[in-house]
UniProtKB/Swiss-Prot annotation:
This is Protease HtpX homolog. It is found in: Cell inner membrane. It comes from Chelativorans sp. (strain BNC1). GO terms for molecular function: metalloendopeptidase activity; zinc ion binding. One of its GO terms (cellular component) is plasma membrane. Residues 282-313 are annotated as: Disordered.
């Protein structure tokens, strides 16, 4: 079923790409857009994960360079029955994380230094379990390719302003078509990202909680990350907004207008769902859910030794 949804999504994004090409250059522009979209779909399948990691300046780590973080991911991957993914760190003060890769055998997870410094080991485990749930649900291919195509569609809409005004370009709609391409194309791509991310985040939250066995670890992490995302601007995400839906929390929340078209479900609703799930597990709320300030620092923080210890500490 996931493969069918992915195929339908790629078909829609390709059709949107062709529609923008038609608005810019008529039937000739549409055919050129089709060729470009087909090439991008093929290229994205093999390279989108590398492109996204490069956009955010992710650096691969191992058990020597980041022992506790790496061990958390390794233990969770074993619990989920997944191959060990490649593990990356992003030097960014905003706490956040994402997963990418075309399949579980070629998956990668990435966490920011802000996340590793500000979250407890248990909360980091909750976040990484969520990302591994995306890998297990095979969301990563769809989400990564969508990020690449959405960025291309937005760029094509911008090109319309510069190249669409030529009278010889066979544009049947004239300047009106150019305006439509500039405005509607990026919005349509954003709506697709919203539809993908909002439904899959809830599923990944639930499966991630099952993997780590503690729904409130993830709930506590979401509360901390959401608060910080409104205060700390993620510069790389602002430069590449098409990748926003990959992250566990919208990285664009530091800007005032970004919540208007948020790619993520409401954080409070996600936390409430996890708390309800914790009721089934018989868990008690951790302190960080009841306080405004973050708790003990995480695997790379100075006070990690004072944090409540769990299986991955």
């Amino acid at each position: 079923m996931n493969m069918i949804r992915t195929a339908m999504l790629l078909a829609f994004m390709t059709a949107l790409f062709m529609a923008v090409g038609y608005l810019i250059g008529g039937s000739g522009g549409m055919m050129i857009a089709l060729v470009i979209a087909a090439a991008m779909n093929l290229f994205s399948y093999w390279n989108a994960d590398k492109m996204v990691l490069r956009m955010h300046h992710a650096v691969e780590v191992d058990e020597r360079s980041a022992p506790e973080y790496y061990r958390i991911v390794s233990d969770l991957a074993q619990r989920a029955g997944l191959p060990m993914p490649r593990v990356y760190v992003i030097d960014n003060p905003q706490p956040n994380a994402f997963a990418t890769g075309r399949n579980p055998q070629n998956a990668a997870v990435a966490a920011t230094t802000g996340l590793l410094h500000s979250l407890t080991p248990e909360e980091v485990a909750g976040v990484m379990a969520h990302e591994l749930a995306h890998v297990q649900n095979r969301d990563t291919l769809t989400m990564t390719i969508t990020a690449t195509l959405a960025g291309a569609i937005s760029m094509l809409g911008n090109f319309a302003f510069f190249f669409g005004g030529n009278r010889d370009n066979n544009n049947p709609f004239g300047f009106i078509g150019i305006l439509v391409a500039m405005i509607v194309a990026p919005l349509a791509a954003m709506v697709v990202q919203m539809a993908i991310s909002r439904t899959r985040e809830y599923a990944a939250d639930r499966r991630g909680a099952e993997i780590c066995g503690q729904p409130l670890w993830l709930a506590s992490a979401l509360a901390k990350i959401s608060r910080a995302a409104h205060r700390v601007v993620n510069v790389d995400a602002e430069r590449n907004p098409a990748t926003a839906h990959l992250f566990i929390i919208n990285p664009l929340s530091g800007q005032r207008m970004d919540n208007l078209f948020s790619t993520h479900p409401n954080t409070e609703n996600r936390i409430a769902a996890l708390q309800a799930m914790a009721g089934e597990f018989g868990n008690a709320p951790p302190a960080s859910l009841r306080e405004d300030e973050p708790g003990a620092d995480g695997p790379w923080g100075r006070s990690a030794s004072r944090a409540r210890k769990g299986p991955w500490s």
